[in-house]
């Protein structure tokens, strides 16, 4: 939990260089297990929560708009699995998947895919610095998105903390393994 000036000024903007307000506090959880309690505390204090990874976005999503905000920096959440075959709900065959935490740098996932003889579809120009959580939050794409879709097109499931400070797992059902807008219906299973 950081209230110092250097931490706050380091989280006042992203790649846009827009500057509106300093956050009140910067939170840097050491593990995913800390996330629900941090979110609960922020909500109880009436703070606006701003998740942030590498700060490479050009949409302003990581910029505090008022001083009553808490930036949750996910850069320490760097656990990553191997590319493994997995049967997704509603599919009749295994597909290659990889599990990561939100702070994993995009290039690490691309390297893991390449090591498995595959291509990671999401390739923003900021891949060396951007994080997977931000790729998902901003629906990152890159030049490969034309063929293989964006972050959301390729997302099988994710976990998040709700405003009630509960974990929610969201899984895409009957994934079309292609662009989400090509599917007539996109269905998801929610598990608390």
Predicted regions and their residues:
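FAD-binding subdomain of flavoenzyme oxidoreductases
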Residues: 79-90, 96-192
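Acidic/proline-rich low-complexity IDRs
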Residues: 44-46, 176
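Short hydrophobic alpha-helical runs that function as membrane-insertion/retention elements
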Residues: 50-51, 121
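Glycine-rich beta-strand-to-loop/alpha-helix junction loops that act as flexible
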Residues: 52-56
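Glycine-rich active-site/cofactor-binding loop and its immediate structural neighborhood
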Residues: 46-48, 72
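N-terminal flexible segment immediately upstream of the FAD-binding catalytic core
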Residues: 1-40, 57-97, 125
């Amino acid at each position: 939990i950081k209230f110092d000036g250097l931490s706050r000024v380091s989280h006042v903007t992203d790649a846009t260089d827009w500057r509106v307000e300093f956050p009140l506090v910067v939170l840097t959880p050491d593990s995913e297990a800390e996330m629900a309690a941090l979110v609960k505390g922020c909500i109880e204090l009436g703070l606006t929560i701003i998740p942030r990874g590498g700060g490479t976005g050009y949409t302003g999503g990581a910029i505090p708009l008022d001083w009553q905000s808490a930036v949750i920096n996910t850069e320490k959440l760097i656990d990553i699995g191997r590319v493994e075959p997995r049967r997704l709900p509603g599919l009749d065959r295994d597909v290659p998947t990889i599990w990561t935490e939100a702070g994993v740098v995009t290039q690490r996932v691309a390297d893991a895919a390449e090591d498995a003889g595959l291509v990671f579809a999401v390739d923003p120009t900021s891949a060396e610095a951007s994080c997977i959580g931000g790729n998902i939050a901003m629906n990152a794409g890159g030049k490969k998105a034309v063929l293989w879709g964006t972050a959301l097109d390729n997302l099988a499931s994710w976990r998040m903390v709700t405003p009630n400070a509960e974990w929610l797992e969201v899984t895409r059902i009957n994934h079309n393994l292609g662009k989400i807008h090509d599917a007539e219906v996109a269905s998801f299973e929610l598990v608390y």
